């Protein structure tokens, strides 16, 4: 079963403050609060937010390549064939004489002939059957086509059939959090977070007694925001260039390992808080009683999560109307080649006001590589048991 699911590590660097709001106003330190883990109270980027915006960016990536090559949906219906997939195949065959539609490229997956911008976001016509590809709502907007790589990879729901999708997103949790200190900016983390991300070195135990660990271990004391803590020793963490985002590289000497019990307190005390005010368009001055504050995950924060791709091509009994399914390689390419949109268009709220941009790094999980090597036959003994 493990061979059917491919996992990828996700490391994300916030290049702008990131605001994923909880909705509405609250009474407290700030008016607009951000999403937090209900157990640890540490801010995070929910997997639902990541999946939704990545779906949109995948659509943008595909349309940028096929916009002038894809047919109208009415042209597909004119093709011979009983099912929609047969009509698509016949249209592609008519185009392949000039190499217009190369299905080996993920941009030109068979079902992408029906892809529209509305395949991202909420379906406008969920009450229609999958075969009704020209259906529109009262505003004339189409819905999820149910045939393209995006619909099959991220999921869709129609009157006659629903599909879970093949890509599964975890939350992005904070791994390294930047804090100002007397020694400059340092990034705090915990042993538990290093374990979950696969970065924990051997010999590093949990810190206790409100002491922290640094690379040098000779600082005596260090301030993390308003907290003044004793340095209890050294850590042996070696990133070996694992946390690199183009020109940015996190160094071992920049990392401070703190007790799990203090991590939430330090993070929540050092979030970015931005004060905004509404402007009267007539006077050009601030409106009275229109001041509000918003908190955000600060620039420089590094987050960690994972994405699993579930290969359902080997399933028997999949309805014919769902075929063909994209393979894992095509879905992985789609994610990797569309993630650059996060660097320009961002994620979350207030992206037009200096928020939201992140850099994403995708890589295969180390344990999967080990498992692949473990399953390879041993050439020294003919592949038998040792």
Tell what function each PLM region has.
Residues 1-386:
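RNA-binding basic/glycine-rich loop and surface signature characteristic of RAMP-family CRISPR effectors
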